[in-house]
UniProtKB/Swiss-Prot annotation:
Catalyzes the oxidative decarboxylation of 6-phosphogluconate to ribulose 5-phosphate and CO(2), with concomitant reduction of NADP to NADPH. One of its GO terms (molecular function) is NADP binding. Substrate binds at residues 102, 128-130, 186-187, 191, 260, 287, 451, 457. Homodimer. One of its GO terms (biological process) is pentose-phosphate shunt. This is 6-phosphogluconate dehydrogenase, decarboxylating. The active site is at 183 (proton acceptor), 190 (proton donor). The gene is gnd.
Amino acid sequence: MGADIGFIGLAVMGENLVLNIERNGFSVAVFNRTTTVVDRFLAGRAHGKRITGAHSIAELVSLLARPRKIMLMVKAGSAVDAVIDQILPLLEKGDLVIDGGNSHYQDTIRRMHALEAAGIHFIGTGVSGGEEGALRGPSLMPGGSAQAWPLVSPIFCAIAAKADDGTPCCDWVGSDGAGHYVKMIHNGIEYGDMQIIAEGYWFMKHALGMSYEHMHHTFTRWNTGRLHSYLIEITAAILAHQDTDGTPLLEKILDAAGQKGTGRWTCVAALEEGSPLTLITESVMARSLSAQKQARCKAHRVFGSPVKVSKAETLSAQQREELVSALEDALYCAKIVSYAQGFELLSHTAKRRGWTLDFSRIASLWRGGCIIRSGFLSKISAAFAQQHDLENLVLAPFFAEELKRACPGWRTIVAESVRQALPVPALSAALAWFDGFTGAALPANLLQAQRDYFGAHTYERTDAPRGEFFHTNWTGTGGDTIAGTYSI
């Protein structure tokens, strides 16, 4: 009898997923382009387990039970297409190919249609949780050929992380590229979460003058409350970690952040949908700005520090604790906004593409295994379960009340950061979005007047029904013709 599933790609994530699958009672056949990697894996971590090695893709396919299921964990992009091109002639109708890499959702849509035309099922699945999650239980977000889900769901649900209530952090997301799109949104939210935490740390250090030990204890305390999450937990651990000389290691880590591109994909998707993803976009741009280390140092030599004396030196213990409490409010509010914007983008795309998505279930998939896992997600899941047509997360009764209560502290932190020249792009962008979203009137009326003035783009009037458009001859020398192809 053949192996339950085949696996191509034995980097650390691939190896760990294979071991996870085998540990949960399934047999696996594996292949890697560099075949010595297969031999090393079989002689080492896979020794004595129900894992069989192959030295060619043809051999791998021959080792599998029908219908054959092959999961790819290779670098996103052309490498995925190259492997699919090699596999396709060896497969039969009804077989299944699964892409578990960080592929762009539009590539997943293209691949699914191409393989379905040949009678082959295709699933693109988001895998979150890093190396440890792959081994112990990741969050899985599969989408693609719906008929294929029963073929792989027993394996996926077995290896996935389990939430506190025992529910697998895995479920069918939706058709064509929905799985990878949801993973992209997850990654964008991850960028946002990380940035607001970094801004909180920076405020503690520079506005409040807190020691690393004090910051460590504060984040540890926060992790027992409403900010409880994996990222808060590891931040507390990072702040306590010392270098070999006994000083905080964080002091020696260069402030130039890297990124792999999935955050940018989320921002581009938001621009394409016209969805205001301000917090996540600023979080991506903050990394880009940080990477300009040499230019920033040059600018610092030119402009110096705008604030000569830190307020931290004059704070009483009570004032410092009040600001720490306000900072907790700020991080909490911004976190709500990050998810609100992420799910709004998801909603816009789902409507355009005809995806039927269960936002409550999607939020629950992230409760365990993944990088953004937190207790907070149960509240989001409940909000969407109670109101399936919820227009925006901030309008859910629970989150609306939380924002009303915590908003004053949020404003305090953003205002104090501006006064002390501390950049908080994510916290401030989130607040600006919140004020705009909750504002019944905005200055966009002037924008429309300007557009009509120079381009005859027309405008709607407050004293006329929506959908009725007007044009004004602003200078007396124009005309009554409205804009055609020219627009801005």
